[in-house]
Amino acid sequence: MSDAGTFGEYGGRYVPEPLQEPLADLADAFDEAIEDDEFREDLDFLLEHFGGRPTPVFHAGTLSERYGAEIYLKHEDLLHGGAHKLNNTLGQALLAKRMGKDRLIAETGAGQHGTATAMVGALLDMPTQVYMGTTDIGRQEMNVFRMRLMGAEVTEVTRGSAGLAEAVDAALEDFAADFEDTHYLVGSAVGPDPFPRMVREFQSVIGREAREQIQELYGELPDACVACVGGGSNAIGLFHAFADDDVAFYGAEPGGEGPDSNRHSAPLSGSGSAESEPQQFQGMRTEVIDEGTENHSVSAGLDYPAVGPEHAAMAELGRAEYHAITDDEALEAFRELAESEGIIPALEPSHAIALAKRLADEHDTLLVNLCGRGDKDMATAAELFDLT
C-alpha cells in the first residue's frame, strides 16, 4: 500500500507488491508528460483535429422554460465517438506510446469508453483488448460492433453480475499479468493512483472550455454545475475548473429502483450511505454500496458499485452534493430533452438532466454536462417507451 494520490482519507494505491513499481513508474511518466510542452501540443492537436474540440455550450431555451431555470448544456456528446471518453483515451494512449507500451487494454460498461479506446488504438496502431460484461454486451450491441470494426478484441466477462465492476476486475488481472508491454487505459476517475488524477487531468478540458464559454454566453459563472456520477470522470472534468469559484457542484448518482431500495448504484446518496465507512476496492479507498444492495442502473455506464475517491472526498468536505436519481426520473428527462430541444442524450447524462430539473427551484442558472449522446440507448428507449 502507498499513500500516493490521496484525497483526504480516500484514494491511495492499494495493490499487490508486483504492481507497486509499475504504477509508480506510470505516475512518474504522467507527471513528466503533463509538464512537457511537446506532449501537451500533440494532445491538443489531436483533441482539436481528431476529436473536434472545443465542444460548444448551448442554452436549452425550451427546456429552461419547462424547468423554470436557465439550463446550459456542455455538448460533450458532440465529441468524436459520441461522448467525453475520447479526452481521456487520447491522453492516456499518447502517454502509453511515450512509455514504449505496445498494447492497450480497457474495461467498458456502456461501451463508450471501449469505443474511444478502440478509436485511439486504431489511430496510433496499438492492438487493443476491451473487457465487457455479458449484461452490458447484451444492451450495448452497437458499441460492440463499433469496437470490433475498429480492430479491437472484445472479451466477454461472465463472472458475478457480469457488469462494469467485473470488467474492471478482468482488466486489472490482465494488467497484472502483462504490465511490461501493456497499458491499462482506465476509463473513469477510479482505481489506484495515478489513475484518478490522470483521468481528471485529461478530462479537465471540459471545465476549462465551459468556464470560458458560459461567461461569453451568460456574462457570468453559473450558480451550479451538474453532472452524472458513476466513477465520476465527466463530473470531475467539469467541476475541476470551477473549484475555486462560488459555484455549487451536484453529482447525479444512479438511484436505480430508488435510493432506499436494494437495487441502486449510489454509494454517496443511497441506502446506508450516511453510516458507511470507506473500503478498499479495486486498488483505491473509497465509498462502496452496502453489501446487501444489488448494483443496478438502467444506464450501463453508471452501474458501478463504488465512486471515484475525489468525489468521496468532496462529499465528505461538503464541496459537492450527490443525489440519487431513479431509473424512472432519468428516463423522463431523456424524453423531455429530446422533445424540448431535439437532443437525444445518453441515459447517463439523463440522470444529470433529471437532477437539474430537481434543482431548478434552488438555482437560477445550471450548467449541465451532456457527456454522451443517446444512439447507443435507442433500443432500450424504444422498448421502454413503446416506440416500435
Residues covered by each model-derived region:
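Positively charged, low-complexity intrinsically disordered leader regions
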Residues: 1-11, 17, 24-101
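Buried hydrophobic positions in well-ordered alpha/beta secondary-structure cores of metabolic enzymes
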Residues: 12, 56, 73, 85, ...
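A short, small-residue-rich loop immediately preceding and capping a beta-strand
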Residues: 80, 88, 98-133, 221-234, ...
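Short glycine/serine/threonine-rich phosphate/pyrophosphate-binding segments
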Residues: 82, 86-92, 106-124, 138-141, ...
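Active-site-proximal loop->helix
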Residues: 103-105, 113-171, 260-272, 380-386
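Glycine-rich ThDP/TPP pyrophosphate-binding loop and its adjacent helix/strand module
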Residues: 166-174, 181, 190-246
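Active-site/ligand-binding loops adjacent to catalytic centers
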Residues: 168-194, 198, 246-247, 251-343, ...
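Claisen-condensing/thiolase-fold acyl-transfer catalytic domains that form or cleave C-C bonds
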Residues: 229-233, 237, 327-387
